[in-house]
């Protein structure tokens, strides 16, 4: 069968003869071609890192962040089309607030991820344009440890130990697989994540980019937080020194 839509890509409700929904595949490409984002679950927390494009020097610092709180204990990081990702974040936040109002307790991370996945599926099923964004959800507590979910533009929802999305996702996954992530604490994960982002960057194309990080773990008392700028800077400096050291060894 042809990989070209040939008329079957005009609506998200239309299957091709070989069972594909081209509109959803196109939405996935919006994530696949976006800046690299990786999320890693370590021994005492979860870290997510995005290589964010800064398209203008006139932007204020940290304009258009990719990472947010859903509630105090769950963070979300959106990849792909920014307005679509922001809409998914708002939906997740609204669901968490309704849960808190109804049950007087924070909405569990798996319920949040499942709710967003179902929303994406129903939205697409209703012959609307698919969301061109994916969303990582992360949490940590003493009972369950770290948890990490990714909801994709198709509505698929999986739990991961670590994962990467974006244009350098395959190279990033290969680097992650070299690490014994279950032995690393969040401070070590921050450094290694910064190193991975720098390793997979295309020096000729990936210019005007900025690393954005979020974490949740034992040291944050289970609260999702943005990684302080001084910690990010220190991680970048460590990563540069590590890469220079590796180059000298080679």
UniProtKB/Swiss-Prot annotation:
One of its GO terms (molecular function) is identical protein binding. PROSITE patterns: PROTEASOME_ALPHA_1, PROTEASOME_ALPHA_2. Pfam families: Proteasome, Proteasome_A_N. One of its GO terms (cellular component) is nucleus. The keyword Nucleus applies. Its main location: cytoplasm. SMART domains: Proteasome_A_N. It comes from the Eukaryota. The keyword Nucleus applies. It is found in: Cytoplasm; Nucleus. GO terms for biological process: ubiquitin-dependent protein catabolic process. Keywords: Cytoplasm, Nucleus, Proteasome. InterPro entries: Ntn_hydrolases_N, Proteasome_alpha, Proteasome_alpha-type, Proteasome_asu_N, Proteasome_sua/b. The 26S proteasome consists of a 20S proteasome core and two 19S regulatory subunits. The 20S proteasome core is composed of 28 subunits that are arranged in four stacked rings, resulting in a barrel-shaped structure. The two end rings are each formed by seven alpha subunits, and the two central rings are each formed by seven beta subunits. The catalytic chamber with the active sites is on the inside of the barrel. Belongs to the peptidase T1A family. PANTHER family: PROTEASOME SUBUNIT ALPHA/BETA. The proteasome is a multicatalytic proteinase complex which is characterized by its ability to cleave peptides with Arg, Phe, Tyr, Leu, and Glu adjacent to the leaving group at neutral or slightly basic pH. The proteasome has an ATP-dependent proteolytic activity. This is Proteasome subunit alpha type-3. It comes from Caenorhabditis elegans. The gene is pas-7.
């Amino acid at each position: 069968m042809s990989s070209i839509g040939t008329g079957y890509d005009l609506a998200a409700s239309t299957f091709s003869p070989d069972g594909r929904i081209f509109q959803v595949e196109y939405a996935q490409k919006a994530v696949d071609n976006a800046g690299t984002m990786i999320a890693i679950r370590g021994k005492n927390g979860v870290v997510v890192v995005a290589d964010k494009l800064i398209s203008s020097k006139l932007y204020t610092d940290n304009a258009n962040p990719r990472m947010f709180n859903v509630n105090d204990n769950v963070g979300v990081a959106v990849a792909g089309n920014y307005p679509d990702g922001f809409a998914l974040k708002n939906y997740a936040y609204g669901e968490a607030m309704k849960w808190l109002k109804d049950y007087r307790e924070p909405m569990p991370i798996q319920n949040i991820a499942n709710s967003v996945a179902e929303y994406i599926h129903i939205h697409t099923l209703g012959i609307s344009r698919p969301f061109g964004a994916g969303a990582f959800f992360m949490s940590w507590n003493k009972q369950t440890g770290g948890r990490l979910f990714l909801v994709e533009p198709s509505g698929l929802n999986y739990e991961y130990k670590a994962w990467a999305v974006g244009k350098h996702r395959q190279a990033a996954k290969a680097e992650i697989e070299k690490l014994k992530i279950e032995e690393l604490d969040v401070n070590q994960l921050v450094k290694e994540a910064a190193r991975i982002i720098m390793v997979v960057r295309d020096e000729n194309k990936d210019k005007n980019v900025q690393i954005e990080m979020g974490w949740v773990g034992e040291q944050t008392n289970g609260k999702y937080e943005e990684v302080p700028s001084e910690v990010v800077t220190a991680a970048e400096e460590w990563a540069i020194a590590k890469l220079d050291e590796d180059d000298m060894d080679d």
